[in-house]
Amino acid sequence: MTTTIYILNGPNLNLLGQRQPEIYGHETLADVERRCAAVAAEKGFSVRLFQSNHEGAIVDQIHEARQAACGIVINPAAYTHTSVAILDALNAFEGPVIECHISNVHKRESFRHHSYVSLRADGVLAGFGIEGYELAVRRICSLCAGG
């Protein structure tokens, strides 16, 4: 069994820490990776972080994860509400999937309240800031270890 967890991030998350810090905070995607790697290492796992502004690139990473990852943490960002392609790719992945959002999407515009990804996710975290990623990694570690 692989002990790698894929952490996939969608559009505009490359600007984390710069774009709308009042919503998303001041920490960067590099901070997310560092914090998640530390949590995973405590449990004997590793992480592979990927970000793209392109839907097909995210789908390709999910396909790769079928062979290379025990679980996926995904923040599809705007694709949460629009991407059947990402949902279909996740449906082809057999391991656990946790959907993670930095902000509380249910407290924001109504179009953000619907998630295609939630139809596949084993759990959803929203509104915990980047700490949500750490919580998601802990849960994936537990699920991958049989818990």
Swiss-Prot record:
EC number(s) reported in the record? 4.2.1.10
Q: Where is the active site?
A: 24, 101
Q: Which reaction does it catalyse?
A: 3-dehydroquinate = 3-dehydroshikimate + H2O
Q: Which domain of life is it from?
A: Bacteria
Residues binding substrate, per UniProt:
75, 81, 88, 102-103, 112
| A Pfam cross-reference name | DHquinase_II
Q: What does this protein do?
A: Catalyzes a trans-dehydration via an enolate intermediate.
HAMAP family under this entry? AroQ
Task: Please identify the protein, giving its name as recorded.
Answer: 3-dehydroquinate dehydratase
Which organism was this protein described from? Answer: Cereibacter sphaeroides (strain ATCC 17023 / DSM 158 / JCM 6121 / CCUG 31486 / LMG 2827 / NBRC 12203 / NCIMB 8253 / ATH 2.4.1.) (Rhodobacter sphaeroides)
